[in-house]
C-alpha cells in the first residue's frame, strides 16, 4: 500500500494593505485545508509565497526586494517561489520575464487555486483587473490575535489619476450583508473580539 505524501511546508510574506492581509489569510486557509504545513519560518519553508503590493513605488520596491530575497534562497532550503497579489495582476508578465526564479503566479482571482499553483506552478497572467469577491465560505487562517479585518468590498470605481487600484483590483463590488454577518459570526467563534472594516 502506497503512503500518501504529506504536502510540503509553505511560508507566506504578506505586504501591503488590510485587503492583502485578508487575501493572505485566504491563501493560508486554503493551503491548511488541503493539508499543507504552514510555517512562519521562511528559511524552513519548502515553498514561499510573496503576496505583493503595487500601490505606490515604495511598496513595489518592497515587494521586489522580498521576491529577490526569497529568490536568492532557492536551492538553499526554499524549493519554490510563488508571487501573489496586486503586482501579479498589474506586472505579472514583467516579473516572469525579469525574475526567472519565480515558479508560479497567483492572481487576485486565483487565490482558491493556490494548491494547484503550489504543486504545478503557473504562468503569469496578462494584466487584468480582478472580478472576484470572496465571501464567508472562503477558508481563512487568521494571522492576528483578538482582531481581524472584514473585507466588505473590493475594487474601486473612481478613475483617479494618481491611483491604479481599479486596474488590478477591478471595479467596485460589495459583499452581501448576509455574507458579512456570517463571516463576522465565524470570526467571533474563533475568538475575534474586534472587527476592522
Specify the residue positions occupied by each region the protein language model found.
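Proteins enriched for Cys/Gly/acidic motifs involved in redox and nucleic-acid/cofactor modification
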Residues: 1-196
